[in-house]
Amino acid sequence: MSLNQKITKAVALWPKDELRPWLSFPKTLDTSIRARLQKMPPQQANKQLNALNNLLDNVYWNKYIPKQVVLKPQFKPSYYESLTQIRRKEEKAPLWKRLFKRK
């Protein structure tokens, strides 16, 4: 498999950000990683791609498990879940409500 195919495969598997769907991290990642890996020697580029695939496979998450203090802040333990719920609720709202919502 060529370097470009490996990059395309890894970027396609990258999850979308539920809280900021208007930002396309995979697209940004694709652009920046292609430019950088093209300039590297093949052996170093493969190491970088392996690191990217390890991120996708949660290798580092499982190796360095984050503490609950990070995942559930003391000031509001359900902070991240409530953000996700609010975002989903906004997506389901009719278009006119989303357009004229007061901020």
Swiss-Prot record:
Broad class of where this protein is predominantly found: mitochondrion
Coiled coil residues, start to end: none
Localisation per UniProt entry: Mitochondrion
Assigned keywords, A-Z: Mitochondrion, mRNA processing
GO terms for cellular component: Cbp3p-Cbp6 complex; mitochondrial matrix; mitochondrion
Disulfide partners: none
Entry's Gene Ontology BP terms: mitochondrial respiratory chain complex III assembly; mRNA processing
Record's keyword annotation contains Mitochondrion: yes
Function statement: Involved in processing of the 5' terminus and the intervening sequences of cytochrome b pre-mRNA.
Stated name of the protein: Cytochrome B pre-mRNA-processing protein 6
